[in-house]
A protein has these predicted regions:
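PLP-dependent amino-acid enzyme catalytic core
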Residues: 1-312
Length: 312
């Protein structure tokens, strides 16, 4: 029987789990680490899931209709996912992004036909959000999905990512590790997994130099895609059991390690999440348990960054 898809968004989800056997052996880890490889989504990241979810819901409720203009602040991946979806559905898309994000992200957005507005890097995501809201107030028939406040964000992960992890491990997942950007992934996956297995441990990962969740103090950092500098509305702060701050350099080193040990190219936030997962996997009390770490995107969009530019 043939299995032929008719739109790119039908390809979203059902991403594979890869056991990191080489890293487990090299570092003599006590636990299994399974990596959820989100770059298998058609536009290359976990954010494809929420792009589809937010657009589907907006079309269902009539907020989006033919001729609408989508405007969204993004650190990159949500913008790329929205650009793919908007192209396929015929919407004009304006993305607002801090100028400090990688040049590859800018190029990818434009490649899908999106318009790009850059904001001052020092203002971070707050600056991008403010500019997007300003544009939305000026442009007729505009729709602002608002990934940081939109309940369709965590909903996508409750309905897809969480069930996929539970099913693919036959319910054997003991610990889930993910970086926190909007908070949608860890909220949706965490809520689903705890509904099926209440003793599952949820570990949040954030940049050490902008450890808002653990210290309340925001700052500049280089781990693109996580650490927005504030606590997003969609983040369920009761869902995680532990917060692990990660230094920028550890994220870079571990991202390169993934490429060189496992032959899998992932991004900076994936390096941060994997470093945290490896730290958990070294604990004696974790022996024999199964850790699932979500690796949010591909490393292709970071070739110009310290992740791969002049690596050690």
């Amino acid at each position: 029987m043939s299995h032929i898809y008719t739109s790119a968004d039908q390809l979203i989800g059902n991403t594979p789990l890869l056991e990191l056997t080489h890293i487990e052996q090299a570092f003599q880890l006590k636990a299994r680490i399974l990596a959820k490889l989100e770059y298998f989504n058609p536009a290359g990241s976990v954010k494809d899931r929420i792009a589809k979810s937010m657009i589907d819901e907006a079309e269902r409720t009539g907020q989006l209709k033919p001729g609408s203009v989508i405007i969204e602040p993004t650190s990159g991946n949500t913008g790329i996912g929205l650009a793919s979806a908007a192209a396929a559905r015929g919407y004009r898309l304006i993305l607002v992004m801090p100028e400090t994000m990688s040049v590859e992200r800018r190029q990818l957005m434009k490649a899908y036909g999106a318009e790009l507005v850059l904001t001052e890097g020092e203002k971070g995501m707050k600056g991008a959000i403010a500019k997007a809201e300003e544009l939305a107030s000026e442009i007729p028939n505009s729709f602002l999905p608002g990934q940081f406040i939109n309940p369709s964000n965590p909903k996508a992960h409750r309905e897809t990512t969480g069930p996929e992890i539970y099913q693919d491990t036959d319910g054997a997942v003991d610990i889930f590790v993910a970086g926190v950007g909007t908070g949608g992934t860890i909220t949706g996956v965490g809520e689903y997994l705890k509904s099926k297995k209440p003793d599952v441990q949820i570990v949040a990962v954030e940049p050490a130099s902008s450890a808002v969740l653990s210290t309340g103090v925001a700052g500049a950092h280089k781990i693109q895609g996580i650490g927005a500098g504030f606590v997003p509305d969609v983040l369920n702060q009761t869902i995680y059991d532990e917060i692990i701050p990660v230094e920028d350099q550890k994220a870079f080193e571990t991202g390169r390690l993934m490429a060189r040990q496992e032959g899998v190219l992932v991004g900076i936030s994936s390096g941060a999440a994997l470093w945290a997962a490896m730290e958990v996997a070294k604990r004696r009390e974790i022996e024999g348990k199964t850790i699932v770490v979500l690796l949010a995107d591909t490393g292709d969009r970071y070739l110009s960054t310290p992740l791969f530019a002049d690596p050690d």
